[in-house]
Amino acid sequence: MDKTVHNLPSLGFPLFQTSLVTGSQIDDLKRGIGISDDHCDPIAWINNAVAYGQKLVSVKAGWGELPTGFVAFDMMSRRELQGEEWVAKCSYNLHGVFVNPALRGKGHGRALRRTISDIIEANVQTIQDRGFADKVEIFFEAECITADGATFVRALVSDCEKMIEKMSERRSADDTFRIVFKNCIDYGDYDNEAGFSAPAP
């Protein structure tokens, strides 16, 4: 995925662009999120993503010059034989998500969630189309340290579950390919769903 444009008509314009961040775009991302403290968590997440080869996806509204938010995550896949069937184990570990505080509640987080869901769907579809496995197990991991982050993760898990349900509905009756979603989320102090009042990033 180089660049994805998401049109969210229910939220009105502008469109949202999400793209994988390359080394030359790191400084623009740091400026765009509105954080100047090099020791804060969002900057650390960006630096760690670069240092450890994590996926770093940015988002910006309309055709603006600077990205204004991002999500950093690891994506790993392996295949193993269990009994008489091949199982693909796909792990997604969310390390950080952040949107410029002045722009929250406008749809940036939704665009980032949709992009991650699209990436997972494309990965599963490739495994199925190429016959790599009879079954896919998706492991989604995250540790929530803020209410906004927990809200984002909860919505992302819901998006992924709906995506997997739709993929399952599209299969023919004689298709034995299976998808299993395993939620390994640590919501910490934000485990009470009724306690969420802050808008998602």
What are these regions (language model features)?
Residues K106-A111:
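A short glycine-leucine-enriched loop at secondary-structure breakpoints
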Residues M1-L103, R114-F139, C144-P201:
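Non-catalytic substrate-recognition and accessory regions of acyl/acetyltransferase enzymes
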